[in-house]
Amino acid sequence: MKKTLLIFIPFLSLLGQSISTDQLDQLTFRNIGPSVAGGRIHDIEVLPNDPATVFIASASGGIWKSSNKGTTWKPVFDDQAVSTFGDMAISLSNPDVIYAGSGEQQNRQSTSWGNGIYKSENQGETWRSIGLEKTYHIARVIIHPENPNIVFVAALGNLWNSSKERGVYQTTNGGKNWKKVLYIDDMTGVVDMAMDKNNPNILYAATYQRMRKAWGFNGGGPGSGIYKTTDGGKTWNELTGGLPPGDKGRIGLAASKTRSNIIYATIEHADSSGFYRSGNGGRTWKRVNKLNPRPMYYSHIFVDPNNDDIVYMLATEFYRTKDAGKTFYQMPTRPTYDVGVHSDHHTLWINPNNSNHFFLAGDAGLHESWDGGVAYNRLNNIPIGQFYGIGADMEVPYNIYGGMQDNHSWMGPSATRHWLGILADDWKQVGFGDGMYQQPDPESSMLYNASQNGNIIRVDRKTGNMQGLKPFPSDSKEKYRFDWVTPLAISKHSSKKVFLGGNRLFISDNGGDSWERTEDLSSNTNRDSLTIMGVLGADIKLSKNDGTSSYGEIISISESPLWHRVIWVGTDDGNIQVSRDGGEKWEEVSGNITGIPAGSYVSRVLSSIRDRGSAYVTFDRHREGDWKPYVYRTEDYGKTWVPLTRGLPSGSVNVIAEHPDNPDVLFLGTEHAVYLSVNAGSDWTKFKSNLPTTLYDDLLIHPREKDLVLGTHGRSFWVLDDTSPLAEWSTVYNKPVHVFSVRAATLFHYWKDTSYRAQEEWAGENPPYGAIISYLVNSDVDSVTITVKRRKNQIIRTYRQPVVKGSIQRLAWDLKYPPPSSQQNESKTEGLQKPKPEDIL
C-alpha cells in the first residue's frame, strides 16, 4: 500500500550531525560555462572507420566525445578518479578499443597528476583502469597496428619526486599485465615515443630528466636522450650520432608516415637546442634549424602523413616547414589570436586522406581548418575552462567572475531570461593574460582584476575603462615578488580597502590608487641555495624555474569578517602570518602546527565568522610528492591548531569556505572533488551529486542568494542554488519531515530573444525559475504532497513528489497558479524535479 504525506507551505511567510553522499545526491549543480574560451587539450583522436567521431583528451577536464564532427560534445570520463590526460590511442585493427594515459606531460606549475592507463572497448562510452597507477604522468600511448592487445606506454613519471615507476611499459594482453622494457633512473621518464610506420617492432623513445618543486624547476640532466628498439621493445640502444653531448632537456619525436628511416626531433640543449633530422633511422642526426621555443612546455612536432618534408612545430606560435626543417614559417592567425587561433598549441591531428584538413588544439581549446591553416573554425563548445580564482557581485541576478589559465578574465550572469540558457554571448571579457582573482566592488561598478605575477587593474564594468594598479618599489634596488596566482581581496568592512599579496602585503585605502606595504611576510629563502635533482638552483641550465618567476610570496589573504584589524596571510614557503592591528605587526604561527613539515605550501587561509581568533588553513604538499590532505583550525589566533581531515582521501586541498549562516558548515575544493562538513570539520563527506571529477581551485558562497559557486580548473563554473538547507541540516536532520527555509523568489519570464543559432553552440543551464522548495522526509512513505497556500489558506498550487528517504529533495514552484487543464500537456514548468502533468492535483 502506497503512503502519501501532506506538506502545507504558507508561501508569504516563507520569504525570507554528519551527512552522507547519498543524502546530497538530489541537490544538483548547474554547469553555466563559459565555453567561449576553452581549456588546455593534449590530444585529438578520430575514429579511423568513422571520421565523424572525434575525441579530445584535456589537461584537467577529462575526455570528451563528438559523434558529429564537433557539432556537439559529451564528457565520457566524469565518473572516474582523475580528469587529466597526456595522450590517447585508437586501435587501427579494432577501433572499438581505445587506451588513454592519464596525467599531463607539460610540466607546468598548475599541472595535475593521473593514476595510470585506462581502456575502453566500446568507442569511449565506458572506461576501466588497467594499471600503472603510480606513473602519474603518461606522455604517449602507441598501439600495435595489427593487434590491439599490444600497447606501449611512455611513462614520464612523478613530476615532483623521484620514483621508479617511469620509462617505457609494454603489455601484450590488453593491459592485464605490464612489463617495463626501458628504464633509465628514478628521475628520468619517457616524454615522447614514435613507431615506424612500416615495422611495428621499431620504436623510438625520448627520455627526459626533470623535476619541479614549489620554488622552481630543473628541466634537464644526463638522463635525457633518444633510444631505439628494433625487436619490439626487448632491447634498446641510445642514439648519439650527431646529437649534442652532455645534459639535455625535453625532446620531441616524430616519424615519417611514408619513409621508414626519416625521423625528426626537437632537442633542448644549453648550446645546441633546435630541430634535428635523421635520414637513416636515427643512426646519425643533423641540426637543421635552431627553432625550439619554450621546450619545457611544448616540444611537439607532427609530420604530414602524405609528405614527410612538411613538418609542423607547435609552441606559443604554430610553425610549418615544407623543406624538412631548413626553413620554418609562422602560420597566420586571422584576424587576431583571440578572434582567430589562440596561441599556445599542444596537439595536432592531420587527416590522413586530406592533409589540408586538421584539428589544432592547445591552451584555448580546439580549432579546425579545411584549407591547410588559412582559415579556422573555432570549436568553442566544450566547457573545459581552467579557472584560478573567482568572484561574484550583488546584481540581480548576480554575475560571476573568473580568471582563466591563458584565456583572460571573464564575467557572466548566474541566470538569464534566454530560453536557450546562458549563452556564449552573455560572457564578457574583463581582463587579459592569464586571469587570476577577481573582486567586484559591491558598492560601485569597479572590478579589481588580477593576472599573472602581480599584475592588477581596476576595470569600470560600465565603460570598460581600465587602469593599472600594480605597486612598484621606490627603491630601485628592491624587487617585489608576486606569485603566478597573485591573491587579491576587498575588505569586508570598506569596499575602498583592497589587499594584494606579494612577498609583502600591500594595502590600499583608496581603491588601489596608492599602496601601503607591510614587512616581508615570507621566509625570504634564497632559492639559488636550494637543490633539485642534486643541482643547486643557481646552477640549473635548462628551463630554469620555468613557470615560477619567484619564490617566497603570499598565496592567500583573509581579513576577519568580524574585525577589520585582524588579517591572515599564507605563503608558498610555509609561513602563516596573523596581524591583530591592521597589518602593523605580524606573528608567524605555522610553527605551532604539528603533523606537517615546515615550509609547506599554504594553499588557503580563512578567517572564520565564529570569532575573531578563529581561522582555517589548508596546505598543499603535492609539489613535494606528498598527496595527503592537510586542513587545520585554530580558535586562538594560531597558538594551537586542530587537524580536520577525517573522511578526506588522498589528494591535495586547494580551498576552504565557510557558510555565512552557520560556521559549522564548511566546503573544501580539492584536486579531484568537493567535500562538505556540517560539523565544523570533524568529518567530511564527498559532495558528488552530478559534479564531474576535476580540479576545484576556488569556491564561494554568495552572501545574498547563498548559492555555492565552484571555480574549477578544467570544467568552468558550476553553481548549486541555495545552500540554506545545508546550514539548517544539523538541527533538523532527524525530524520525520521538514521544509527548509525558502528564500525570496523573483518571477522570471523566458524571452525568446535569439533565434537561428548554430547547433554547435553550447549553453549553460539556467536556474529553476521561481521558488525553490527544499524538504526532508525521514518517514516511511512513498510520496509527499506539497501544497502552496496563501495566508488565508487559499490553495495556489499542489504537487505530488516521490520520496527519497533521508535526502534533501527539491521542487521548484514557478510562482504561478496551475494552467488550465487543456494546457497542462504543453506546460514547461521549470524545476529541479519537473512534475509530470498527472502529478499536479
Please provide the spans of the model-predicted regions:
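Solvent-exposed residues in well-ordered beta-strands and their adjoining turns
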Residues: 491, 720, 776-778, 814-816
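Bacterial Sec-dependent N-terminal signal peptides
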Residues: 1-20
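Beta-propeller blade termini and top-face loops
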Residues: 17-761, 768-771
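Glycine-centered tight-turn motifs at strand-turn-strand junctions
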Residues: 597-598, 795-840
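Aromatic/hydrophobic beta-strand junction motif of beta-rich domains
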Residues: 253, 771-779, 813
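Solvent-exposed loop and beta-edge segments used for protein-protein assembly and interaction
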Residues: 245, 570, 765-769, 780, ...
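Beta-strand-rich binding/interaction modules
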Residues: 456-459, 773-774, 780-798
